[in-house]
């Protein structure tokens, strides 16, 4: 018989080292705000009547400062024309529909009426625009005596420091002739004045 080979010694199984505690899960990244798709004027269906379009074209032409009357306005004038036509977009909304131009482009880039019309249609469909009642209600908060007026100085401060801040010159232009002898402003009349253009 063949001699038995000694069996190799089996090492005693060492206990596995205790697993390190799992690191705390990384905090989930903050969800990104959904990006609004870029505004595409070609995708806007125009619902205005021929008479309305003619009226809009006439108003648009009043803002045309090109030497030869090319029916073009600067990007910087777009919000003014929209407001002159009874719309009330925020500056941010105007910039969005213009493709978020750089500040230095606002008085250089031009917009023709055919490009402006879909912008006007889009803005006019926006239901988030403030109404007369919304603005009056917002100003009523500052009517400490419940007499239909707000202090002109307080309104100046609010317009220059909150929301879409206005420059001092813009505030003065807006409030020109609105204050009474006591420095108060009848806010219902003020809102009517602003919304009438």
Curated annotation (Swiss-Prot):
GO biological process, one term: positive regulation of ATP-dependent activity
One GO MF term attached to the UniProt entry: actin monomer binding
Disulfide topology: none
Modified residues (N,N,N-trimethylalanine): 2
Spans annotated as Disordered: 1-42
Annotated InterPro entries: CALM/Myosin/TropC-like, EF-hand-dom_pair, EF_hand_dom
Record text on subunit structure and interactions: Myosin is a hexamer of 2 heavy chains and 4 light chains.
Protein name stated in the entry: Myosin light chain 4
Originating species: Homo sapiens (Human)
């Amino acid at each position: 018989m063949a001699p038995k080979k000694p069996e190799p010694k089996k090492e005693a199984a060492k206990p596995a080292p205790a697993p390190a505690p799992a690191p705390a899960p990384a905090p989930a990244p903050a969800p990104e705000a959904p990006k609004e798709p870029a505004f595409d004027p070609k995708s806007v269906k125009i619902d205005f009547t021929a008479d309305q379009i003619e009226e809009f074209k006439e108003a648009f032409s009043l803002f045309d400062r090109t030497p030869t009357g090319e029916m073009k306005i600067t990007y910087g004038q777009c919000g003014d024309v929209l407001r002159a036509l009874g719309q009330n977009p925020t500056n941010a909304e105007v910039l969005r529909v213009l493709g978020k131009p750089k500040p230095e482009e606002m008085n250089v880039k031009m917009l023709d009426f055919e490009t402006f019309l879909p912008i006007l249609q889009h803005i006019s469909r926006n239901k988030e625009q403030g109404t007369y009642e919304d603005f009056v209600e917002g100003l009523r908060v500052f009517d400490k005596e419940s007499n239909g007026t707000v202090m002109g100085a307080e309104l100046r401060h609010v317009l220059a420091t909150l929301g879409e801040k206005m420059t001092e010159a813009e505030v003065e232009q807006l409030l020109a002739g609105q204050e009474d002898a006591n420095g108060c402003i009848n806010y219902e009349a003020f809102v009517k004045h602003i919304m009438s253009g």
